[in-house]
Amino acid sequence: MKKYLFFLLVLFCVELNSQQKNDISNLSGHTLKNAVRFNFIPVGMPRNFDPDLKPTMGLLGVHYQIPINNWLYGGVGMHAAITGDQGGLFTLGAELGISKKIIRKWFLDANFHFGGGGGYRYLVNDGAFLNANIGIKYQHKKYAFGVQFSHLNFYTGEIKSDAVSLFLEIPSVFRFADYKNAQKEFTLNNQDEDNFWKKPSTKNAQQVRFDFFKPIGNSKKDNVNNQAPLTETLYVLGFEYQKYISEKSFLFIHTDAIYKGLRAGFMDLFFGAGSNIHQSKSVNLFTKLAVGAAGGRVAPEGGFMIYPSIGIDLKLTNSFAISLHSGYYRAIAGDLEAYTGGFGLKYFSNTGGTETTLNKEYKTQGIHIQLQNQTYLDVQKTDSDNVDLQLIGLRFNYDLNNTFYLIGETGFAYKGESGGYAHGIVGLGISSPAFLDEKLKAHLEFAGGAAGGAGVDTEEGIVIRPTLGLSYQLANNFSLYASGGKMISPSGNLNTTNINVGLSFGLATLRGKN
């Protein structure tokens, strides 16, 4: 074992010392004018199937849309129930759409979205759903909004609805280089020279969180537990992304999944804004306010939540900090209520430009974004015979160097009578040097996190997943990825063989060296 650790350490050190610095004016880049879209769909519920259901579920969606050409776009999106009695229903999917100018600032906008997810399984069955939308969009310089006719169909379940939906779209600019230029160092030799990267940089932060929810008030468990009082402390694993819009203010998105306290199945998704009320070289004091959705394993509620919090960042370096935080977690139209506290590891960076940083030295950060189909064979369940599961998965790989990378991934079931099952995992990967005409790489990965829902036997939710895989470069930044391994729950009976196949897009972001 010591020999293996020594070998890995040598690889890491070799990578750190093999960097050559280049002039930043020689680094070619690309600009994507993306959009973040929020939409709201009032979904009619199947009361002929279950008369006790509330008539309408309000579904909030957030979508990240990327232009393919001047009229076609693709992207990924999530939905969450925020009104009605389906709190805890979440989805993940991929989409393809068109936006075609009609006249002046008015556009025809239509898209098709496929994904997986769910809440109460008897209403969604496998979890697969289709969402088709068509309507008009008004394009302003700083935002867009529109109205659409929407068809939502959990086609193996009972939820099928036509409705008029609304959306708000916020533009976003993203600058990046080809992945072949990742993990290289650059110098800014002439600050006055005009080049592609002489643009404002974006400050952002990413955080892995470990939180504890202490339920209070009239918080209750789900119907399976006869809505007994919820008194157990909930242990949750979360991830948060922050984008600064000024020196002190930021927007953020944040999600959690339970791994202890209740049987797995509880999760949340929040959007919000925050401000650093005090900043120094060693400490940030901050306040945040978020709204979003939460549910699963608690009494049926609408799902809409509010979450104010305060905290402190204790800076270890210019890039890393230990973050401590506490808050108040409250359902807007329900009983779920809790005090929260926790800690996290936060990473700060300035990316995408050189104009607003004091840096003279820069480095390109390699990132892979993958959309996967994941298969889990002979999955153990608590309420039925073993089944084969199909999941739609979204993952991000962040290169530490040319060999090691960090992993963040989520997946939602769409086939296997387990709608509502999902996982969120993080981990470490090792990739080999490229071979066979420098197109093929081997990958060894170890990840763990929280998973559960729909009777999949993960007990309280902790899972680990070792895998071995291959990637093959198709063209420029695109590659095929395939892997196989095991998904195991240490506290439950889950022990399943896992096969993953997906398409990966690689890129390199420019960040200032601290």
Spans of features found by a protein language model:
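Transmembrane beta-strands of outer-membrane beta-barrel pores
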Residues: 40-46, 78-84, 98, 114-120, ...
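Surface-exposed strand-loop-strand hairpins of Gram-negative outer-membrane beta-barrel proteins
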Residues: 42-62, 76-77, 213-240, 376-395
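Repeated loop/turn-to-beta-strand initiation elements of outer-membrane beta-barrel proteins
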Residues: 70-75, 104-108, 138-147, 174-179, ...
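Residues that define the transmembrane beta-barrel architecture of outer-membrane proteins
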Residues: 54-60, 86-92, 126-132, 160-164, ...
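Outer-membrane beta-barrel "beta-signal"
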Residues: 40, 160-192, 209-217, 337-376, ...
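Residues on the lipid-exposed face of transmembrane beta-strands in outer-membrane beta-barrel proteins
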Residues: 62-66, 94-100, 134-138, 166-170, ...
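Bacterial Sec-dependent N-terminal signal peptides
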Residues: 1-24
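Transmembrane beta-strand segments of Gram-negative outer membrane beta-barrel proteins
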Residues: 26-44, 74, 110, 198-218, ...
